[in-house]
UniProtKB/Swiss-Prot annotation:
Residues at the active site: 98 (proton donor)
Gene: ribH
Molecular function as annotated in GO: 6,7-dimethyl-8-ribityllumazine synthase activity
InterPro entries: LS, LS/RS, LS/RS_sf
Organism in which the protein naturally occurs: Methylorubrum populi (strain ATCC BAA-705 / NCIMB 13946 / BJ001)
Protein name as annotated: 6,7-dimethyl-8-ribityllumazine synthase
UniProt binding sites for (2S)-2-hydroxy-3-oxobutyl phosphate: 95-96, 137
Amino acid sequence: MVSQRRDADAPKSILESLAGTRVLVVEARYYDDIADELLAGARAAIEAVGAEARIFTVPGALEIPSAIAILMEAGRKAGGPYDAAVALGCVIRGETGHYDIVAGESARALMDLSVSEHLPLGNGILTVETMEQALARARVSEMNKGGGAAEAALSLLAIKRAANLEPAR
Protein backbone atom coordinates (compact mmCIF):
# COMPACT_ATOMS: atom_id res chain seq x y z
CA MET A 1 0.00 0.00 0.00
CA VAL A 2 0.87 3.67 0.05
CA SER A 3 3.01 5.10 2.80
CA GLN A 4 2.49 8.64 3.91
CA ARG A 5 4.01 10.94 6.47
CA ARG A 6 2.16 10.74 9.76
CA ASP A 7 0.77 14.18 10.52
CA ALA A 8 -1.28 14.83 13.66
CA ASP A 9 -4.49 15.03 11.63
CA ALA A 10 -3.68 12.10 9.35
CA PRO A 11 -5.89 9.02 9.72
CA LYS A 12 -4.53 6.29 11.99
CA SER A 13 -4.32 4.01 9.03
CA ILE A 14 -4.71 4.43 5.33
CA LEU A 15 -6.71 1.22 5.37
CA GLU A 16 -9.19 2.68 7.85
CA SER A 17 -9.74 5.65 5.56
CA LEU A 18 -10.85 3.33 2.75
CA ALA A 19 -13.64 1.58 4.63
CA GLY A 20 -17.01 2.18 3.00
CA THR A 21 -15.63 3.24 -0.35
CA ARG A 22 -17.26 2.00 -3.55
CA VAL A 23 -15.00 0.29 -6.06
CA LEU A 24 -16.15 -0.40 -9.60
CA VAL A 25 -14.78 -3.65 -11.02
CA VAL A 26 -15.16 -4.30 -14.74
CA GLU A 27 -14.08 -7.73 -15.89
CA ALA A 28 -13.75 -9.36 -19.30
CA ARG A 29 -14.66 -13.04 -19.06
CA TYR A 30 -13.16 -14.19 -22.35
CA TYR A 31 -11.25 -16.83 -20.36
CA ASP A 32 -13.54 -17.85 -17.50
CA ASP A 33 -10.96 -19.72 -15.40
CA ILE A 34 -8.57 -16.77 -15.51
CA ALA A 35 -11.39 -14.29 -14.87
CA ASP A 36 -12.50 -16.27 -11.80
CA GLU A 37 -9.02 -16.03 -10.27
CA LEU A 38 -8.54 -12.34 -11.12
CA LEU A 39 -11.92 -11.49 -9.62
CA ALA A 40 -11.30 -13.53 -6.47
CA GLY A 41 -8.04 -11.68 -5.86
CA ALA A 42 -9.55 -8.26 -6.53
CA ARG A 43 -12.60 -8.92 -4.39
CA ALA A 44 -10.46 -10.11 -1.46
CA ALA A 45 -8.25 -7.00 -1.60
CA ILE A 46 -11.27 -4.69 -1.76
CA GLU A 47 -13.11 -6.42 1.07
CA ALA A 48 -9.94 -6.50 3.21
CA VAL A 49 -10.14 -2.72 3.63
CA GLY A 50 -13.90 -2.69 4.21
CA ALA A 51 -14.73 -1.34 0.77
CA GLU A 52 -17.61 -2.46 -1.44
CA ALA A 53 -17.03 -4.01 -4.87
CA ARG A 54 -19.61 -3.56 -7.62
CA ILE A 55 -18.87 -5.95 -10.48
CA PHE A 56 -19.80 -5.67 -14.15
CA THR A 57 -18.86 -7.98 -17.01
CA VAL A 58 -18.01 -7.17 -20.63
CA PRO A 59 -17.11 -9.52 -23.50
CA GLY A 60 -13.45 -8.59 -23.93
CA ALA A 61 -10.59 -6.38 -22.78
CA LEU A 62 -11.19 -3.72 -25.41
CA GLU A 63 -14.64 -2.97 -23.97
CA ILE A 64 -13.39 -2.41 -20.41
CA PRO A 65 -12.37 1.28 -20.70
CA SER A 66 -15.68 2.25 -22.32
CA ALA A 67 -17.65 0.35 -19.69
CA ILE A 68 -15.72 2.05 -16.87
CA ALA A 69 -16.38 5.49 -18.38
CA ILE A 70 -20.10 4.75 -18.82
CA LEU A 71 -20.52 3.29 -15.33
CA MET A 72 -18.55 6.08 -13.63
CA GLU A 73 -20.84 8.65 -15.27
CA ALA A 74 -23.95 6.64 -14.39
CA GLY A 75 -22.82 6.45 -10.77
CA ARG A 76 -22.28 10.22 -10.62
CA LYS A 77 -25.69 10.94 -12.14
CA ALA A 78 -27.42 8.50 -9.79
CA GLY A 79 -25.82 10.12 -6.74
CA GLY A 80 -23.77 7.05 -5.87
CA PRO A 81 -20.40 7.67 -7.50
CA TYR A 82 -17.63 5.12 -7.44
CA ASP A 83 -14.44 6.08 -5.64
CA ALA A 84 -12.09 3.89 -7.70
CA ALA A 85 -12.11 1.36 -10.51
CA VAL A 86 -10.41 -1.93 -11.34
CA ALA A 87 -10.04 -3.43 -14.82
CA LEU A 88 -9.67 -7.22 -15.05
CA GLY A 89 -9.10 -9.34 -18.13
CA CYS A 90 -6.61 -11.31 -20.16
CA VAL A 91 -5.15 -11.04 -23.64
CA ILE A 92 -3.10 -14.00 -24.88
CA ARG A 93 -0.94 -13.56 -27.96
CA GLY A 94 -2.23 -15.41 -31.01
CA GLU A 95 -1.12 -15.75 -34.62
CA THR A 96 -2.32 -12.32 -35.78
CA GLY A 97 -1.72 -8.69 -34.84
CA HIS A 98 -4.98 -8.55 -32.89
CA TYR A 99 -3.08 -9.02 -29.60
CA ASP A 100 -1.03 -5.86 -30.13
CA ILE A 101 -4.13 -3.79 -30.83
CA VAL A 102 -6.15 -5.08 -27.87
CA ALA A 103 -3.26 -5.00 -25.39
CA GLY A 104 -2.01 -1.57 -26.42
CA GLU A 105 -5.33 0.18 -26.92
CA SER A 106 -6.95 -1.11 -23.73
CA ALA A 107 -3.93 0.00 -21.67
CA ARG A 108 -3.81 3.39 -23.40
CA ALA A 109 -7.53 3.99 -22.94
CA LEU A 110 -7.37 3.05 -19.25
CA MET A 111 -4.44 5.39 -18.66
CA ASP A 112 -6.17 8.21 -20.56
CA LEU A 113 -9.31 7.70 -18.49
CA SER A 114 -7.41 7.58 -15.21
CA VAL A 115 -5.39 10.72 -15.92
CA SER A 116 -8.15 12.83 -17.49
CA GLU A 117 -10.73 12.00 -14.80
CA HIS A 118 -8.30 11.78 -11.84
CA LEU A 119 -9.70 8.28 -11.41
CA PRO A 120 -7.88 5.87 -9.10
CA LEU A 121 -7.73 2.88 -11.44
CA GLY A 122 -5.91 -0.43 -11.21
CA ASN A 123 -5.13 -2.18 -14.49
CA GLY A 124 -5.42 -5.93 -14.06
CA ILE A 125 -5.59 -6.80 -17.74
CA LEU A 126 -3.00 -9.52 -18.24
CA THR A 127 -1.05 -9.44 -21.50
CA VAL A 128 0.76 -12.74 -21.89
CA GLU A 129 2.18 -15.18 -24.40
CA THR A 130 0.59 -18.41 -23.10
CA MET A 131 -2.29 -19.76 -21.07
CA GLU A 132 0.21 -21.05 -18.51
CA GLN A 133 1.59 -17.54 -18.00
CA ALA A 134 -1.95 -16.21 -17.63
CA LEU A 135 -2.91 -18.77 -15.01
CA ALA A 136 0.26 -18.19 -13.00
CA ARG A 137 -0.40 -14.44 -12.94
CA ALA A 138 -4.11 -14.74 -12.24
CA ARG A 139 -4.11 -17.35 -9.49
CA VAL A 140 -4.57 -15.92 -6.02
CA SER A 141 -2.15 -18.57 -4.74
CA GLU A 142 0.56 -17.44 -7.17
CA MET A 143 1.06 -13.90 -8.52
CA ASN A 144 -2.46 -12.62 -7.69
CA LYS A 145 -2.54 -9.85 -10.29
CA GLY A 146 -6.25 -9.24 -9.64
CA GLY A 147 -5.47 -8.45 -6.03
CA GLY A 148 -2.55 -6.30 -7.13
CA ALA A 149 -4.77 -4.27 -9.46
CA ALA A 150 -7.29 -3.66 -6.68
CA GLU A 151 -4.51 -2.67 -4.27
CA ALA A 152 -3.16 -0.24 -6.88
CA ALA A 153 -6.57 1.41 -7.25
CA LEU A 154 -6.96 1.64 -3.47
CA SER A 155 -3.46 3.09 -3.10
CA LEU A 156 -4.25 5.76 -5.68
CA LEU A 157 -7.50 6.53 -3.86
CA ALA A 158 -5.56 6.95 -0.61
CA ILE A 159 -3.19 9.37 -2.39
CA LYS A 160 -6.15 11.30 -3.81
CA ARG A 161 -7.66 11.62 -0.35
CA ALA A 162 -4.34 12.53 1.26
CA ALA A 163 -4.05 15.32 -1.31
CA ASN A 164 -7.54 16.48 -0.26
CA LEU A 165 -8.92 15.95 -3.75
CA GLU A 166 -11.69 13.69 -2.49
CA PRO A 167 -13.25 13.55 0.97
CA ALA A 168 -13.35 10.28 2.87
CA ARG A 169 -16.82 8.78 3.15
